[in-house]
Amino acid sequence: RNRCKEEILSFRCHPLRARSLIESLLSKRAAIQLMPSIERPGLDEYFMEIAIVVAKRSTCLRNQMGALFVKNKRILTTGYNGAPAGLEHCDVVGCAREGVPSGTRHELCPAVHAEQNAIIQAAMHGISIEGATLYCTHQPCILCAKMMINARVAKVVYLHCYPDQTALDFLEQAGIEVVRVEE
């Protein structure tokens, strides 16, 4: 109390104004102490939430996927799945993989995967993703896993499973840490 009072009085304000300021500060401090503590998300949760927002840009009719590369707590690039630049999007022409089981026949799909788009953005802008962490809404497929390995990504954090155990095996064999976060 005395320290606050001394600080306010050092501004040489009118004594009545000083008293009002002191009372205001003390009541705000008491109010803050009574507030419930704020639960701050961990970094994996924080960056995964951003990947979820990135996925909302997707035009895929089957799955909206988002990805981002992070290094030293800084976002390097983002990507979402969709048709290559200049081509019609799936939400306009329809899904080429309609009726095809999930995790199979990737070659039929014209879309670029979220992870691939994030890598392309890094390459286009001269950003190294070596040693970075990939946050993606879905587990990477085998094609994207091979790209992560060659790009020397350090860690992959994903939310939703994808029916491609080989991709996970490849990542682990390459020494890339793989973490699935809970919803």
Task: For every predicted segment, state its role.
Residues R12, S20-E183:
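Zinc-dependent deaminase catalytic domain
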